[in-house]
Amino acid sequence: MGRVEDGGTTEELEDWDPGTSALPAPGIKQGPREQTGTGPLSQKCWEPEPDAPSQPGPALWSRGRARTQALAGGSSLQQLDPENTGFIGADTFTGLVHSHELPLDPAKLDMLVALAQSNEQGQVCYQELVDLISSKRSSSFKRAIANGQRALPRDGPLDEPGLGVYKRFVRYVAYEILPCEVDRRWYFYRHRSCPPPVFMASVTLAQIIVFLCYGARLNKWVLQTYHPEYMKSPLVYHPGHRARAWRFLTYMFMHVGLEQLGFNALLQLMIGVPLEMVHGLLRISLLYLAGVLAGSLTVSITDMRAPVVGGSGGVYALCSAHLANVVMNWAGMRCPYKLLRMVLALVCMSSEVGRAVWLRFSPPLPASGPQPSFMAHLAGAVVGVSMGLTILRSYEERLRDQCGWWVVLLAYGTFLLFAVFWNVFAYDLLGAHIPPPP
């Protein structure tokens, strides 16, 4: 709690909580008269226009002035505006933003600076400063900017010709992934190349290395699962090795053959990397690994005799989340040939599922045992439509503030607990006949 003196009275203020403050009502302008109170913000006051309706009491304006004082860090308005014009320069405002510890994350501070610099005169008036600091905001700062009609300039860098190769790629990613123009401009403005999208690239590289090692060792590059030695890998999930918990995740590094690896690697790079650039390593890695884990656990429940290989659970989680996001925001997406690309993606994904179904029910070789299950593909798609869509729709918003996120997280946690108990008790209770592990 803090206190500020204004006009001879002392107002007790709330802690800085942007969600509880309000925009100054219309009809208020900055008056020239001086106040007699102490404190730097008492040099100028808010004064209603002659024809304006009655306004709330001074407490509302005191809150705005107190929050502005927090930004000014003790500097008087006379020092910031020595000529008493009612404006401060954008450069001065930028220095204030970055030189004081405000309870806003760096991205939001950057947006404050961007809004200040978007002014044609390069100035910020006192009214705008109070609006920026004390305006009521939703859980997403950039949506508050949109609601408050404070977006980046329409002729911003997204439409500039002569951009470098990397900036053109960033613009392409913004158009491909984000459905809202405000989001696209916000992403383009604040994107930094460091850290790079290392997760999807690292996973893809590791999968290729593992495939090359086993291919060279077995001299088999297609349908490697028919080779009995391949299924003996400590990375493959097999129902006879359920106690080795790492196999529920590490199976994503093994693949049936070149055909499955090529399909998964292509989608991971074409869809996974742009998603990671926009939404960050933590969210996309969480979604990918959640799809992988759900895939192996679903197989352990629905196809108890089958092993699992391949990263299809994670790949289908990413792809289904992205496709669902495109469908739900069809009008706002700017990617070209949306319908054609959607149909092509669905055909390719369906073909991969068909290949996996054929492989699962094809007659196995005597020494190879049952072939890998296709249920991981379907489980990954379910994770993508539920958890993944929630993540993709929460761009620049904290997931913990989203009610849907907690619902999805609770459902996923319940599934995990059920799957763990199933793997511990159900196999023995049901007398499931499990093929001996290789």
UniProtKB/Swiss-Prot annotation:
Annotated segments matching region Disordered: 1-62
One GO cellular component term: membrane
Tissues expressed in: Detected in heart, brain, skeletal muscle and kidney.
InterPro entries in alphabetical order: EF-hand-dom_pair, Peptidase_S54_rhomboid_dom, Rhomboid-like_sf, Rhomboid_IM_Serine_Proteases
Protein's GO biological process: proteolysis; signal transduction
Membrane topology: Multi-pass membrane protein
EC number: 3.4.21.105
Pfam families noted in UniProt: Rhomboid
UniProtKB keywords: Hydrolase, Membrane, Protease, Serine protease, Transmembrane, Transmembrane helix
Catalytic activity: Cleaves type-1 transmembrane domains using a catalytic dyad composed of serine and histidine that are contributed by different transmembrane domains
Residue numbers annotated as active site: S312 (nucleophile), H377
Protein's UniProt keywords contain Transmembrane helix: yes
Annotated family: Belongs to the peptidase S54 family.
Function text: May be involved in regulated intramembrane proteolysis and the subsequent release of functional polypeptides from their membrane anchors.
Protein name listed in UniProt: Rhomboid-related protein 1
The species this protein was found in: Homo sapiens (Human)
